[in-house]
Amino acid sequence: MAKRIVILGAGESGAGAAVLAKKQGFDTFVSDMSTIKDSYKNMLNERGIEWEEGKHTESLILNADEVIKSPGIPNDAPMILKLKAQGTPIISEIEFAGRYTNAKMICITGSNGKTTTTSLIYHIFKKAGMNVGLAGNIGQSLAYQVAEYNYDYYVIELSSFQLDNIDRKSVV
């Protein structure tokens, strides 16, 4: 039986993680307490990924082998606390995506200048003829790009929230 991956949050990060999880053959489920944008619903539906919005159904989440948490969900949210209490691994979309690519990752974080620096590095790589993707807080999620493209490099803008739930420091 396939490993069950639950993604909490169905924005850019969560939807991208779901696409990659499904492509890797996982039993994939997405849950979002808010309304999911139609474009993300379409992305999930086109790939046969189950999802729910406006709630977190415990019976569909607490049976996960691993959870990918979107960066906007606080670490002290009730569902996160329940998952932690039962020992379910909780990771970020960035860490999950890093498992499925051999691309080199150039990650930019900090208080000021992230977007400018990330864009500048991306454009330098692109102009140099490198096969490069732009991810993180800019453009499509890293997980989506890993699922759909085959880049040699990724230039990634990371907020402090996106650094949460990354255990494998070698990923970034």
PLM region descriptions:
Residues M1-S92, F96:
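N-terminal leader/targeting and accessory segments in enzymes
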